[in-house]
Amino acid sequence: GKRLRPMLTLACARMCGYEGADHVKLAATVEFIHTATLLHDDVVDESAQRRGRPTANLLWDNKSSVLVGDYLFARAFQLMVEPGDLRVLDILSNAAATIAEGEVLQLSAAQNLATDEAVYLQVIRGKTAALFSAATEVGGVIAGRPEEEIKALFDFGDALGVAFQMVDDLLDYWGSEATGKNVGDDFRERKLTLPVIKAVAQADAEERAFWKRTIEKGRQEDGDLAQALALLEPSLDGLARAAGALRDALLQVHCQAFVALAVVGAVVRRNRDDVFVVGILLPRPLQPGADDAEADGQDVGVGQAQLRDHAL
C-alpha cells in the first residue's frame, strides 16, 4: 500500500510544529484502522484481488481475515489512548464508527438504480474521507494548534478523501494492472459508483434495462463488462472534467489550510519540508486531450492514460 493516511498524520503534525513522538503512534493507529477495514471489506465483497495481489481471505480464509481485522481494530484503540488526549481519542474513534456507517450505507444503496450522487457522496465521505480528515485533524490537535487551523486541516483531509475515492472509482473501469486495480470489480460486485450513476442518469430505455439486469438483478453474462464500458465511455469526458473541478476545489481548500497555518507565520517556514510532503499528496489536474490529442492540437477528450496517472 501507499500509506497515504499515516503519512498525512506525520506530515501535518510536523508541519504544525509538533516535536514529540506520539504522532508516530497516531499514524500507526490510522493505518491499523484502514487495514482492518480492508480485511473486512474483502470478506464482505468476496474480493480475490487487492493492489494487484491475492486478498487475505483468498490466501487463507474469511475467518482468519475477520479475526486479524478485529485484532488490528483492538490494537488501534490501544494505541490511540496512549497519548492521553481525549480529543484525539474522540476524533479517531468517531472516524472508525463513521467508516462502518459509510459501509452500511453503501450496502443498503447497492444494487439500487435510484441511488443518486448525493447518496454516493455521503457514502464516500463516510467510508473513505472520514479517515483522511481524522488523519490530518489529529496532526493539528496533537501539536496544540488553534481551532481555525485544526478546522482547515480537517477540511483539507475531507476534500482529499473525496477526491481519492472518486478517482479510485473511475479507475475501476478505466484503470490497469499498473494502478493495482482489477478492472470491473465494482461492476461484478454490483456497486453503484459515480460512473454508473452518471450513465444511468443519461440512459435510454434499452440502456436502463441493461443496468437493471446487471446491477439490480445481478444477472450478468459474458460480454456484459465490455458492454458496460462501452456505455460508460460517452460520460468519460464529463467525469474527468468533474474530477478536475474537484481537484481545483481541493487546491483551494489546500491553500486555505496553509493560510490558516500561516497565522503563526514561522510554523510553515520552519517546517517547509513537511509542507512539501503534504503538497505532493494532491492529485494532478485532469487536462482534456492531453494524451489523446492529434498533432493538429484538436481537443479530442480525456483519455484512459490520464485517469491511470491519477491513481494515488
Model region roles, listed by residue range:
Residues 1-253, 260:
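All-alpha prenyltransferase/terpene-synthase fold signal
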Residues 67-69, 309-312:
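Short C-terminal domain-edge/linker segments immediately following a structured domain
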Residues 253-257, 272-276, 288, 292-300, ...:
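Alpha-helix boundary/capping motif
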Residues 63, 92, 266, 302-303:
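Glycine-rich loops and low-complexity Gly/Arg-rich segments
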Residues 78, 130, 191-193, 244, ...:
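Sequence-pattern detector for short linear motifs
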